[in-house]
Amino acid sequence: MIQEILYDCKIDRTRQPAMFSAASGDEARPLLVGLHTWSYNHTDYYKKFAACCEKYNWNFIFPEFRGPNWWPEACGSDFVVSDIEDAVRHVCQIANVDKKRIYLCGGSGGGHCSLLLAGRRPDLWTAVSSWCPISDIRYWHEQCRAMDLGYYKHIESACGGNPETDAAARKQAMVRSPISWLPNAAELPLAINCGIHDGHAGKGTVPVDQSIFAFNVLAAPEDRISWDDAMYIVRNETIPEHLHCREVDPAFGEHKVLFRRVSNNVRLTIFDGNHDLYENAALEWLSRQVKGEPISWEPGPASAALDPESSQLTS
């Protein structure tokens, strides 16, 4: 049963809240760390994760990690990293966790944080599933200003100024950006997913080039997506003909996979969707990953598909 808990956080010796549920039985079971979105906290968006974890009989924690991302202690800070480390430690102390199967998943602001933790603490995770993530805080600040989205004010509040004009704020933005840390995740199985219409009016707040640039950090040089192709995808909400994908993934249901590429240990999927996270599809892929074993990149079953209206995120 899901419950709200407090757990000890070492960085400032406070107790921070989280939603938590333990797997049943005496057998060691996987742990999923789920992450809230940009403007929310541990009381939002956890129920879909919790339902999936109940189905799989996984341990589950959904930490606060300092709340909405307009606070300096939030938005990819050292507090965030330390609190999530402590969340994993806490569950491993109070529940029977299979240490070879500790997973991380989040979308939007949780996508940002999942990529950040992939880069800053790759040793913690068996695999990471990131959806509609922000990979470059300074660049997203620029994008939000251009789209007249108030998230740029959140970034300025968290970073202590405008990262486009203030050197100290720019440094903060880079430290809080996954793109600065992702090279550390070269050995970690990482699935990055984004809807092609994200970042367009009424369809989402994070343009797909944020996912593309994260993929490019970890991909082999010959597999990286060019700047021109990335800008074409963002502007036109379609895939260039020479990049069209023929792979079918039933786990995405009616949201057709438009582009998919695997390189090294990272996979990028661009699907016909908006600012979405498909929890069942995410957990089905994670469930096949075991530390020390080959990565499973096969498409998922149709049984993993969700109702398309059930997983649209609010940043």
Positions of predicted regions on the chain:
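N-terminal cap/lid segment of alpha/beta-hydrolase-fold proteins
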Residues: 1-25
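Short substrate-entry loop that stabilizes the transition state in hydrolases
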Residues: 26-29, 34-73, 137-138, 200-202
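Primarily recognizes the serine-hydrolase "nucleophile elbow" in alpha/beta-hydrolase
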Residues: 40, 92-94, 100-149
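Mobile cap/lid helix-loop segments that gate and shape the active-site cleft of serine hydrolases
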Residues: 44, 126-127, 133-134, 138-184, ...
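Alpha/beta-hydrolase active-site loop
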Residues: 75-95
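Active-site-adjacent alpha-helix of alpha/beta-hydrolase-fold enzymes
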Residues: 163, 196-264
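Short beta-strand/loop motif that positions the catalytic acidic residue
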Residues: 192-194
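Catalytic active-site module of serine/aspartate enzymes centered on a nucleophile-bearing elbow/loop
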Residues: 260-313
